[in-house]
């Protein structure tokens, strides 16, 4: 059986290793990227079922990468879980400001989890999002 691909985009090696191990031992196929530029390329090439995206990264940060992903016809359908040390309220405030500034409103990510993530919570949210995607049900 083909394993479901999950793209993890995070600049912290320890976090990529943790998430890769968590997803691999849970039956998924983790794909890894260390920054937004690499992440966007892998998202386009690998077409993962789900992306885990850190907010604060070098080269292209998670906020800009999220906007790029959701503006690209090839990747806009891929669900995203934002994972960050930044408070959820702060992230959504910045998204709203960018939406107003650019005049382009984008959908909110399927989930936002503050670091460090609890394994059980992350896996439960991941499965819920993937189940909804398979059944074309509303997201989390």
Language model segments and positions:
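Alpha4 helix (beta4-alpha4-beta5 surface) of REC/receiver domains from two-component response regulators
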Residues: 64, 87-114, 120, 124
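Active-site beta3 strand of CheY-like receiver
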Residues: 46-52
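Charged docking surfaces used in two-component/phosphorelay signaling
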Residues: 17-25
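Acidic catalytic/metal-coordinating carboxylates
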Residues: 35-38, 61-67
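The feature encodes the CheY-like receiver
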Residues: 16, 57-59, 67, 76, ...
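Short hydrophobic/Thr-rich beta-strand motif most characteristic of the beta2 strand and flanking loop
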Residues: 27-34, 42
């Amino acid at each position: 059986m083909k394993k479901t691909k999950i793209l993890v985009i995070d600049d912290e090696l320890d976090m990529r290793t943790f998430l890769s191990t968590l997803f691999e031992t849970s039956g998924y196929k983790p794909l890894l990227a260390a920054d937004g530029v690499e992440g966007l390329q892998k998202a386009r090439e690998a077409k993962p079922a789900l992306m885990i995206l850190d907010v604060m990264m070098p080269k292209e940060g998670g906020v800009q990468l999220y906007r790029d992903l959701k503006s690209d016809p090839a990747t806009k359908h891929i669900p995203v879980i934002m994972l960050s040390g930044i408070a959820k309220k702060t992230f959504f405030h910045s998204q709203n400001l960018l939406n107003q500034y650019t005049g382009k409103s984008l959908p909110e990510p399927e989930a936002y989890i503050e670091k460090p993530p609890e394994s059980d919570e992350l896996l439960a949210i991941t499965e819920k999002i993937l189940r909804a995607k398979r059944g074309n049900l509303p997201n989390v």
